[in-house]
């Protein structure tokens, strides 16, 4: 009876809205796709897609399983990032070797997102996220000196990919597409802004830069915290 009543925007709404807005820049290419995985019923799915149309949110794919687990379908949909407001679901996905991200409230209502600002801003942690945890293990086992020695020795060797590497490389590919659009426009503003945050400090940044170049990523911001808390 409520199928025509729009659902309220969730915690991931602003991110998803800006992500899908990027597709408008490239027509049929559609570099980004969003899939909804829900344990709700297909009837609820009907209301969900009606809500998407209400908010002009072009989500086209989904699975509604009436109480059954949706995890078996993550790989079926070839998902590069599984997002959920449920921390336990995210942790389970990660334990299954799937790329997961926990969406937490920002303290700002989704509808308050600036509709005139379409730039998508994403900050990535480096170690254990973009790359594997080799360097982190070295730090835990051999201390800072061992970690620095490893990174300096392998300064020209890219790191092994981490859990979000696939998503990261897709964003890098989008950056190249976006750069082509602004090639002849000196006032063109990139549609996506990527920041890298890491506990590293010099000289271990050299291998980080090598890895980013190998992945084709042009980060707008790089924060080398040298051990300072990332929460700052």
Model-found features: residue ranges?
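Alpha-helical substrate-recognition element adjacent to the catalytic core
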Residues: 1-68, 116-118, 125-224
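Short, well-ordered alpha-helical microsegments
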Residues: 44-45, 70-71, 89-91, 204-205, ...
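Hydrophobic, ordered structural segments
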Residues: 51-55, 71-111, 117, 130, ...
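Short acidic loop-to-helix transition motifs that present clustered carboxylates
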Residues: 65-71, 108, 226-232
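Short, solvent-exposed interaction modules
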Residues: 72, 76-77, 217, 226-227
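Residue-level marker for buried hydrophobic side chains located in beta-strands
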Residues: 82, 122-124
């Amino acid at each position: 009876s409520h199928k025509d009543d729009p659902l309220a925007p969730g915690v991931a709404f602003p991110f998803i809205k800006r992500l899908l807005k990027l597709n408008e820049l490239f027509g049929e290419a559609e570099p980004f796709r969003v899939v909804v995985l829900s344990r709700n019923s297909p009837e609820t799915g009907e209301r969900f897609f009606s809500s998407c149309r209400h908010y002009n949110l072009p989500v086209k794919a989904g699975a509604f399983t009436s109480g059954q687990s949706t995890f078996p379908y993550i790989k079926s949909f070839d998902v590069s990032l599984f997002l959920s407001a449920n921390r336990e679901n995210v942790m389970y996905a990660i334990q299954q070797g799937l790329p997961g991200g926990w969406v937490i409230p920002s303290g700002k209502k989704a509808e308050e997102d600036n509709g005139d600002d379409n730039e998508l801003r994403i900050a990535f942690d480096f170690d254990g996220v973009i790359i594997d945890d080799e360097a982190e293990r070295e730090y835990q086992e051999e201390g800072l000196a061992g970690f620095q020695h490893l990174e300096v020795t392998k300064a020209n060797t890219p790191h092994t990919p981490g859990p979000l590497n696939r998503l990261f490389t897709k964003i890098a590919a989008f950056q190249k597409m976006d750069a082509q659009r602004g090639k002849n426009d000196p006032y063109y503003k990139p549609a996506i802004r990527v920041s890298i945050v890491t506990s590293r400090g010099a000289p271990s940044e050299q291998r980080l830069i090598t890895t980013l170049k190998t992945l084709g990523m042009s980060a707008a911001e790089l924060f080398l915290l040298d051990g300072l808390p990332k929460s700052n």
